[in-house]
Structure formats: C-alpha cells, structure tokens
Amino acid sequence: MILNEWGEGSYIEPHKEFGFGYLDAIREVFTSAPKAHVDLTPADVGLPVPQVEMTFTSKPQWEFVRDTYGWDNGMNLDNPRIESGALTAVTTGNDPAFFGPPVQIAASRYRRLRLRMRLESAEQQFDDMGQVFWSTRSLAESESTSVRFPVHVDGKWHDYTLNLGENPRWRGVVTRLRLDPCARARVKVQIARIELLP
C-alpha cells in the first residue's frame, strides 16, 4: 500500500523511533485482525554493512618494464611514460603524484608497500619526502589515509619499504593507491616496481 501523506508518496513501514506502533494503529482501525501478532524483521537490522573482500587475481605488483599498468595518470608530472624499463616522468610542481589504477585489495592481507625508485635533479642532491595515499570503499584519499617516507634525490636506485599497516585507516578494501614521489619540481622520477607485501 502506498500513502501520499506529503505529496511525494511513501510506503507504510516501521518507524525508526516508534517501531511498529504506526502499523499497529492502522491494523486496529482498518481491519478486524486480532491484536496478537508477530512483527517480522530481517535478522541483520541494525548491523553494519559487511565489507565483502574481493581478491586480486594476482599479487598486487607492478613491474614497469613495458607497460604503465594504469599508473600514467597523475598531476604535476610531465609526460609519464615507460623509458629504460621504468615508469618515468619529470615533476612540474611541488605536489607531483602518480595515480594508480582502480583495484580491489584486502588491506588485511597486505600491510607493507615496497617500491624501487630513482630520483634525480640537475641542480643538486638532496633529501626530500615522498608519500603514499590510498582510498577505500568507505574512506576518501586524504592526509589521514597516507604514509610519508624520506627519499633521496641523488640519481641512484633505492628500495623503500613502507609499513602501511601501522596506519589505523589502512583497512577494508583498498580501491586506489597514489604515489607522491617527492615534493619538488624539476626532479626526474623513475620507478621500476611497486608491490604490496604481507
């Protein structure tokens, strides 16, 4: 039965505050049904929506030998491409970022991220900060869903391992990763590999 109480229409249904009281009143006024009855409700009323864990068909690992695997989208980067077996770009601003492809990764299975990266500046050698962000089905990408790590801008290859699991917001199903390789302009970035580890 559909009611048109306010003009937009509504269903007769239990009320959050008053439960089945409104329905009981309608039954008593308009029917000859006995007062004794059972109110039926789904067993999962009031429970949180379950997070269904979808699994990666293979290990979440990207080797940038011939393909960008969707990591060629970003900001403050000039011409992300594969060059010399690495995802390569030059930063054009102080907040460069590689946006990863859409994924469905159970955070509980992978608590660390490891990447092999080389940063080079024509001006000088220096240390800087990188950052990895993530979004989940219930959390948007933000400072609170990120981990910072020190990087070396010295033209040499370095392996960086980040403990994402230390952040309490690394949970649920991760839907995208974002890598900020540094926080400077005019830095050549080369990434050979990004992988998630248990």
Which stretches of residues belong to each language-model region?
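Acidic, low-complexity intrinsically disordered segments
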Residues: 65-75, 82, 184-195
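Substrate-binding cleft of secreted/luminal carbohydrate-active enzymes
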Residues: 1-45
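Short beta-strand-to-coil "C-cap" segments at the C-terminal boundary of structured domains/repeats
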Residues: 28-33, 192-198
